[in-house]
A protein has these predicted regions:
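Acidic/His-rich structured neighborhood in mature extracellular/periplasmic domains
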Residues: 1-112
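Metalloprotease/metallohydrolase-associated module, dominated by Zn2+-dependent proteases
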Residues: 52-60, 67-69, 73, 77, ...
Length: 166
């Protein structure tokens, strides 16, 4: 119950942060919360086939899985915008398409410039930004910074505007 209450609060934060039209769409994305699955966090599932091949229900396609309600509270301490991050994957996949040329161009330019090679991390120190993983993670990480707070630098919108020309 504590995790579901925290998830409700996080979704309220998302509702208050993103444009209303975007949140109206994002409310359609199903979020599956599992009690104690051995799963490392939250994940957006774009593919029904992948789910079937890996023993998960195909109904989870185009939805978000939070793999362990008991761990949700500790996850969001390190990644406060975790739900927004996964919803950003849904938006990217369903509304923009993973082949969106603007996102591809921004990701390529950012990777070529090296601006995410070593950045500050919210809990201290520096690390390679998770945004470097691929263009999907780039979009989701920058969405966190734009609308809420990211766990990797740039943490918030003003820093993002200064750090990444997009």
């Amino acid at each position: 119950e504590q995790a579901l209450s925290a998830l409700d609060e996080d979704l309220e934060q998302v509702a208050n942060s993103v444009p209303k039209s975007a949140f109206t769409y994002l409310k359609r994305v199903t979020i599956w919360v599992e009690h104690e699955q051995d799963f490392p966090g939250g994940v957006y599932h774009p593919s029904a086939q992948w789910l079937l091949n890996n023993g998960y229900p195909e109904e989870w396609a185009k939805g978000i899985q939070i793999g362990n309600a008991a761990n949700y509270m500790s996850w969001v301490e390190q990644q406060p915008a975790m739900v927004l991050h996964e919803l950003a994957h849904a938006w990217h996949h369903q509304r923009l398409g993973y082949d969106d040329p603007d996102i591809e161009a921004a990701y390529t330019a950012a990777m070529e410039s090296g601006i995410y090679d070593e950045v500050a991390y919210a809990s201290g120190g520096t690390a390679e930004a998770y945004a470097k993983t691929n263009k999907q993670e780039y979009f989701a990480e920058l969405t966190e910074a734009w609308f809420w707070r990211n766990d990797f630098y740039p943490f918030v919108r003003d820093q993002l505007i200064e750090h990444d020309a997009l």
